[in-house]
Amino acid sequence: MPRQSISKESPTMTTPMMQQYKSIKSQAPDAILFFRLGDFYEMFGEDARTAAPILEIALTGRDSGGGERIPMCGVPHHAVDGYLLKLVSAGYKVALCEQVEDPQAAKGIVKREIIRIISPGTLTDSLVEQANNFLAAVYHEQDWGLAFVDVSTGEFTVFQTESLDILTTELSRIRPSELLLPAELLKAKHWRPYYLTQREKKTYQHTLLEERFTEQRELFQEFPTAMKAANGLWQYILETSPGIDPSHILKVNAYRPEHWMLLDPWTRRNLELTESIRGQGKKGTLLSVLDFTKTAFGGRLLRRWIEQPLLLKGEIEKRLDYVEALVEDSFLRGDLIQLFGKVYDLERLMGKVSYGTANARDLLSLAQTLGVLPQLRALLAEGKSEPLQAFIPALEGLDPLAATLEQAINPEAPISLKDGNLLKAGYSVEIDELRSISSGGKAWVAKLESMEKDRTGIRSLKVGYNKVFGYYIEVTHANSHLIPAEYIRKQTLANAERFITPELKEYEQKILGAEEKVTQLEYQLFLELRETVRGQAAKILEAAHALAEIDVYTSLAEAAVRHHYSRPVMKGEGGLTIIEGRHPVVESMLQDTSFVPNDTILTEDKHLALITGPNMAGKSTYMRQVALIVLMAQIGSFVPAQQATIPIADHIFTRVGASDDLASGQSTFMVEMYEVAHILRHVTPQSLIILDEVGRGTATYDGLSIAWAVAEYLAGQENKPKTLFATHYHELTDLEETHSGIFNLHVGVREHGEEIVFLHKIIPGRADRSYGIQVAKLAGLPANLLHRAKIILHELESSAKESRQEHLFNKEKATQLSLFEVQPLDPLLQEVSELSVEDLTPRQALDYLFDLKERIKAADSL
């Protein structure tokens, strides 16, 4: 849940300004109020106590009336974005209260209003460029409804499902910065990872969204629960931005599961698609290998594609056509990469325009980006690629707006809109005339000073200006006898007197009036320009989406060329064939060695591969590479293989490694079993499953039993999902003899005496050894320990051979029951294995050894 700022201000608050503050604070009691006073945003009372240490600013005080002081702190208005981000990141909402009238024109207290409430989900500035910042809402009736929006870009999506499991999977993909929930859903454990905001149920019943998007009414009928979530989301957007029309939100998109692969959080994590499990951010992920995007919105789109592979063959082929066109046209690809380096974030610029926060520099960035479009259209038209020419219409129609902005905005414009100097000379005749008067003032003052020196004979006479007295004539006391009678004394200094004249006062009013008028007129004309841009939001965002796609296709083509990828052959169903496949991430990180490629063939007849071999030999890398190659193909990317034929997978499931989930109170084994259960519940004939060491989180026989049963279950399914199953339980390799769909693979190892070399090559057949001691040696375990391990291993292997049944399987019944006919451990061995040595005194240990020796002798004599 979000932290809350609870108002505990002094009960007096008798000054008019503090009364105004108290009234406005009551409108946002759960937010820290940034109260605009001149050039600062001030915080008072409990808000100040809370904010000061987080913002690392001084906590002071202010008279609140009745002789009492109230805690206070403040931040400069021009640097507010950074301070907002700090508070929001710390879990607080911030209400931004502005002066909404000119202080000079105000009668009494300046009118102030809350113009925005900033929370994690409504933050629009200081965001990660290549990541979305989603605000989400959930609603539940018979189905579950989810709506999410990035208010900084305008992307708005709804999703409806019968399954809470699928809903939480989708939530884990979008990772909302803030989640809106009705009160009855708040306490459920599913929402723990998110910043929660409680909403009244009635806010989900508003019809403002339907009234706004009348042309999309079919969505309200097709996805009624999801659209109620969207209603609640829209109401929150309007409440947190009063008076703002979010015109950059142009439509509501429906997420349809039949169009995109739903990746569960374990698969996204295990495959390290966009985030590294080693906590290094993007480094070491699939995204890091494929991302050659140059634009922020292209980077966000690529991330979305990686997390949402396609299921429709036609859409996949269309993407592959675009990528292939850019692979083949290296000149076009290079020119596009260079051109995209000049493109700013159109989506977020339009978000700022929509929210009324875009300044002159933002419009200049917009103009520069729109100015690139003619060159881009020419490149696409002249290039060899007919598919890419389909983007040209989306890039047309904005040249006049680009020209207007280019002619209007001053490249040296300040950040503040109230400081003037926003517009270029020549854009407005009236502004040019007023500027002429203002700039001509310096020449007029110099001329007046020269004339007065000549007229009075006072050579030290000066004409100057300050903000308190305006223009003045300064004469030293030594020349006081030469002062003309018409001079009017204004100020006495230690060594001089300052005077004004009617002529000087008249010109002062003319100059200062011109400067004030220029500032006001520039501000008004800038607002008109911004409204003109807002009016073109649909066209600008259409161009932005086209640019994002082209940037992503260019990025995928660049990755394909640099890493020597090939175009996959896509099939609706059937067998999976990968010739000389490589792991895209591992390959990219190798410095001095080349990656060893491997083949993969999974058919409907042979669909489950049991993979054995030692640790560090490459089993996990091999399995992950197969999953990544399939995923890459389904986002429309070329793949790291000499050749690949890919049947479209509706799911990619992975069970790779596990650790305790302390927050949920679940052990490693429980987490592992939950993941396996999830896979078995959702698997289909089109699924690809990666299972690594199922059952190792518990006792040996328990783990072996579960791994065995899971393999049999998948092999016996009518749907026959394609499965790669790595295991250290060598007993499982016998399943090849009784289940036609199962076959064995192992990782090649070359032995040189006591040394081993991992070949990283996947070979048909089973591994006969695990080479655990050799791996331990490579890891640097002490030599005496390794020697002892060899002795124990030899004894255990000998014991196992003697106790093992002559036949593990009953061929006629073809059942796995004989697995459990393995003789149990000898009682003495069992007793020793369970002995708590550390709890024995030296004398007790010695006595126990003598006793054990006598019992063994007695047993041998039987």
Swiss-Prot record:
SMART domains referenced in this protein's UniProt entry, alphabetically: MUTSac (SM00534), MUTSd (SM00533)
Keyword ATP-binding among UniProt keywords: yes
GO cellular component: cytosol
GO BP annotations, alphabetical order: mismatch repair
Binding site for ATP: 613-620
NCBIfam families given in the database record: mutS1, PRK05399.1
UniProt xrefs under PANTHER family: DNA MISMATCH REPAIR PROTEIN MSH1, MITOCHONDRIAL, DNA MISMATCH REPAIR PROTEIN MUTS FAMILY MEMBER
The family this protein is said to belong to: Belongs to the DNA mismatch repair MutS family.
Annotated protein name in UniProt: DNA mismatch repair protein MutS
Organism: Desulfitobacterium hafniense (strain Y51)
